[in-house]
Design a protein with these regions (language model features):
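Extracellular beta-strand ligand-recognition surfaces/modules
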Residues: 1-21, 198
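Extracellular beta-strand elements of beta-rich domains used
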Residues: 4, 19-23, 84, 212, ...
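Acidic-and-aromatic substrate-binding clefts and catalytic sites of carbohydrate-active enzymes
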Residues: 29, 55-70, 95, 125-132, ...
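Boundary/entry segment of secreted carbohydrate-active catalytic domains
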Residues: 31-89
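Active-site neighborhood of glycoside hydrolase catalytic domains
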Residues: 36-46, 232-294, 313-333, 337, ...
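Short, acidic/polar
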Residues: 60-78, 187-193, 276-287, 314, ...
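Substrate-binding cleft and catalytic face of glycoside hydrolase catalytic domains
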Residues: 79, 83-267, 271-273, 324-326, ...
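Aromatic-rich peripheral "rim/lid" segments of glycoside hydrolase catalytic domains that contact
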Residues: 96, 103, 182, 204, ...
Length: 405
């Protein structure tokens, strides 16, 4: 069976029409590969990286639909990876209901649901959190012996604009005092919910989620933010954002309350990291200026070879992050190439992976004991990638490995 999916920019509710569709076979096709016969990525790197992961979707849509509910995909993930990251279903936009599905509940009702309402929260209502996909994914992890990266708590994109307004009404921007309380409510509630769910499923909090992306892409905060967003409330604090530091502190305190601060790592995550490495290091140093609450740096690594970045620049960036002594993880790896050639992509991806492996094996363990603890490939195959030009290890599906695999 085949599913053809169309979408247009803008409102997901807009109607549109197709005049005609023509499907043309341009080649005679390739032999179908049984994915069960392929070598395992996680086994290949098991003595180098603790985690080898992919991103996936529990519900999803189009080519991404039901990835964690289909037997063939589940078996593929179990064989190839030991970690998953939800691509979108744990981002604030989804958890808060997006721009159109906001639901407010009373503080009393929220407390009955286990939400953490801080003393400085003075509003009568809070947003009801949609954690269905998160819970289902945790259940998937428990059933299939797979761990999870939690992505993400704070981002200037994919967070509904009404979250930053008075009374959640989508109009006037809220005050910093109001947002401080909302931030604390959201961060503490998210961590507590996940840890409670872990305990329910496995008997132990901290047993499934090993890393949280607390803040995503702050260095690129001016890049297409939701309007309004964090900067509209707090202003531009450059590389000393008080509210980002607070988010890490809230999250760290929740880990401390469960004795998990040494088992679960809080990450700062960003893209184009090889062009802003010094800023990222400065930001993380600020976050940790009072106490080491940020334990890791996430390198998204959305690459375009051979020049963005060059292998040498990528290696230099790894050196800078490893020198901080913090854990480093490659969190969203995909690699296009300017030529759009499969062999060129394979060569570039090979060089990137060889660089990551070399840096991990040859690091100064007295400076960075753990080093690079994980690599996550951002997607299962090209047709479900957010990027257009052959960025992943498989082409049309899990039975279609590319030379880069």
């Amino acid at each position: 069976d085949y599913l053809i999916y169309f979408e247009i920019p803008g409102s997901a509710k807009a109607d549109f029409y197709l005049d005609s569709v023509v499907i043309t076979q341009v080649s005679k096709g390739k032999d179908v590969i049984d994915p069960n016969t392929l070598a395992s990525i996680k086994d290949t790197y098991k003595n180098i990286f603790q985690y080898m992961g992919t991103c996936a979707n529990y519900y999803g849509y189009g080519a991404k639909k039901d990835q964690l509910r289909k037997d063939d995909t589940i078996n593929f993930i179990k064989k190839q990876f030991n970690s998953i990251t939800l691509e979108n279903e744990m981002k604030p936009d989804t958890v808060l209901g997006g721009f159109y599905n906001k639901k407010l509940i009373s503080v009393d009702e929220a407390k009955k649901l286990g939400y953490i309402i801080p003393d400085n929260y003075k509003e009568d209502e809070v947003p009801q959190l949609d954690l269905g996909a998160v819970d289902a994914t945790l259940e998937f992890c428990a059933e299939n012996n797979v761990k999870m990266r939690a992505h993400t708590l704070m981002w200037h994109q994919q967070t509904p604009s009404w979250f930053f307004t008075e009374d959640y009404n989508g109009k006037n921007v809220a005050t910093t005092e109001v947002m401080d309380a909302r931030l604390e409510f959201f961060v503490r509630t998210m961590l507590n919910h996940v840890m409670d769910k872990e305990k329910e499923l496995t008997g132990k909090a901290g047993s499934l989620v090993y890393a949280w992306d607390v803040t995503n892409e702050y260095v690129h905060r001016a890049n297409e933010p939701t309007s309004p967003s964090w900067m509209d409330v707090y202003g531009d604090m450059d590389l000393e954002p008080v509210y980002v530091k607070k988010a890490f502190t809230f999250a760290y305190e929740e880990l401390e309350n469960r004795g998990l601060q040494d088992q679960v790592t809080l990450f700062y995550n960003d893209y184009d990291e090889y062009n802003c490495a010094d800023k990222i290091v400065e930001l993380v140093n600020y976050i940790n200026s009072d106490k080491k609450v940020c334990g890791g740096i996430g390198m998204q690594s959305h690459l375009t070879g051979p020049e963005n970045p060059t292998i040498d620049l990528y290696a230099e960036t790894l050196d800078k992050f490893l020198a901080t002594g913090l854990e480093v993880q490659v969190t969203e790896l995909d690699a296009e190439v300017e030529s759009n050639d499969l062999e060129d992509q394979a060569a570039y991806m090979k060089s990137i992976m060889e660089t990551i492996v070399t840096k991990q094996l040859n690091r100064d363990k007295t400076v960075n004991p753990k080093g690079i603890t994980g690599v996550t490939i951002w997607g299962l195959y090209d047709t479900c990638s957010w990027r257009k030009n052959i960025p992943l290890l498989f082409a049309s599906g899990i039975n279609d490995p590319k030379p880069s695999f």
